[in-house]
Amino acid sequence: GGIVCGILTLIGDMGKGFLPVFLCLQLRDTALAAPLLKIDQKIWGEVPEWVAMIGMTFVLLAPVLGHIFPLYRHFQGGKGIATTFGCLLGFAPNLFPALILAFFFILFSLVIRITPHFYRTIATYLCAMGIFFIWGETTEQKLGFFLISVVVCLRMHMSGEHRETCKVRLLWMH
């Protein structure tokens, strides 16, 4: 492995989350969207807002589900953290969703140290989900991140790895 492999893996995992979300947001209000989604607006008329919202929610969720439960590895995948960041970065130039998740990961890694990683990840996603419901901009962001959080927390809970006791230490306490 090494650092180069790690960086390339991180870029790839984030990219597979970023690309579908970013492209969906760029294309959904354009003339290209109807043919790509096979919607004939002459027959069906305007796409209802709730259909677009549900579609965007699944576009947010799909890369994370695919990373955590890949078919080709018998549903045994990764934790979905980098892919979640990629999905949230897909909302660019609105970086609020990704910054909230990053804030809590940094907070629980450096200031309020929660160990092991299992508990830190669950605390991060639960706190970020609370902030999303208060200050999230769109229903699709809120619903998408809620579902991602549920899937990531379930994945963490279902992992068969040995769990040490949760330890919480403050930065200034050793």
Predicted regions: what is each one?
Residues 22-23, 110, 130-134, 151-158:
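Residue-level signal for alpha-helical transmembrane segments in multi-pass membrane proteins
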Residues 116-144, 150:
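Canonical bilayer-spanning transmembrane alpha-helix
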Residues 1-2, 81-114, 126-136:
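Interfacial segments of multi-pass membrane proteins
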